[in-house]
């Protein structure tokens, strides 16, 4: 089991059910790339401000890159017993590069780190979904253009109404998806406007 950061506050071992309840690793393992990206930017800032040495920054960045490579290749797996992804990265990094890994969190609370990770993850998912929506709209528009003469009934309040083309009906969905795309763009702009770095 990965070592809990807060274990020193207790004289007895914590019940495994409490550990299971407190663990967020199953959820936040999907944020590991964003966690390491945010940590890399934070380390760079610390070095630029003279808070850590350039050598420590280089070691941290190289260590984070090696963790990312090993995760991608399957050489390293996220420890399911780790309390959260942040602890896993910190402990893995410190095991690889030594004390420089412990200096990574200078001037940054865990809450700051979590807020950044969530925002970066949501932004990444938003961009991904926007790409899927754009591709779907393109496919719908192509099919609509191919069906400009295929007649079908239009519906008003679930009742058959005037005749329309199948292409026209498809374009209604393209229009709805375009509104969804605009909502994602707006949400992403709001995420970008208040980056917690």
Predicted regions and their residues:
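A helix-coil-helix interface module used to build multimeric assemblies
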Residues: 1-197
């Amino acid at each position: 089991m990965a070592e809990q950061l807060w274990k020193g506050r207790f004289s007895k071992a914590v019940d495994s059910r409490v550990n299971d309840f407190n663990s967020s690793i199953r959820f936040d393992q999907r944020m590991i790339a964003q966690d390491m990206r945010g940590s890399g930017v934070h380390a760079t800032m610390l070095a630029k401000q003279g808070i850590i040495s350039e050598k420590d920054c280089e070691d941290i960045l190289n260590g984070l890159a090696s963790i990312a490579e090993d995760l991608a290749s399957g050489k390293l797996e996220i420890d399911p017993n780790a309390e959260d992804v942040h602890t896993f990265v910190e402990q893995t990094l410190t095991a690889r590069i030594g004390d420089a890994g412990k200096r990574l969190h200078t001037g940054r609370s865990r809450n700051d780190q979590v807020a950044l990770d969530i925002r970066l993850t949501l932004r990444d998912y938003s961009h991904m979904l926007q790409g899927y929506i754009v591709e779907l709209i393109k496919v719908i528009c192509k099919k609509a253009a191919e069906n400009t003469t295929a007649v079908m009934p239009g519906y008003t309040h679930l009742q058959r109404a005037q005749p329309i083309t199948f292409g026209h009906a498809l374009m209604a969905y393209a229009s709805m998806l375009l509104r969804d795309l605009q909502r994602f763009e707006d949400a992403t702009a709001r995420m970008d406007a208040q980056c917690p770095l």
